[in-house]
Regions:
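Conserved beta-hairpin
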Residues: 4-35, 39-41
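Terminal and domain-flanking low-complexity segments
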Residues: 35, 46, 79-116
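Non-transmembrane, membrane-adjacent beta-strand/coil modules in membrane-associated proteins
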Residues: 25-33, 39-90
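Short, conserved beta-strand/beta-arch hydrophobic-aromatic motifs that form part
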Residues: 1
């Protein structure tokens, strides 16, 4: 079971869009209504976490619930060290990035066009 946790924990989430929803796959993934997303922002670096409340944290990969400095409890899907997307929904703050910064920027462009 530890091997499975390492495998799924190290795997980047897939993010798909269907029926006015954003689906984040994998461990700690969920479905979010696009209408519930209040803002989407591209920030230059990943958030500073103070501690993990329920998540996976290994080798710079952070997935799950973390306390973020100056924000409190947030949901992270962070694999890279560069730019990061910050989503504010009606109920959560979510940070997403990928090891490939271009992939992060492409997702941001897509979200920015979908969120009104």
């Amino acid at each position: 079971s530890i091997i499975l946790l390492l495998f799924f924990g190290n795997k980047e989430p897939e993010i798909t869009f269907t029926n006015q929803q954003m689906q984040i796959s994998g461990i700690y993934g969920n479905d979010y209504n696009l209408s519930d997303i209040e803002s989407v922002t591209l920030i230059n670096e990943r958030p500073v976490t103070t501690f993990k409340t329920n998540g996976f944290d290994m080798g710079g990969i952070k997935k799950g619930h973390f306390n973020v400095q100056n924000e409190g409890n947030c949901l992270l899907f962070v694999s890279g060290t560069g730019k990061c997307i910050r989503l504010k929904t009606k109920s959560d703050v979510i940070y997403i990035n990928f090891a490939d910064e271009t992939k992060t920027e492409e997702l941001y462009g897509k979200l920015e066009g979908m969120v009104k």
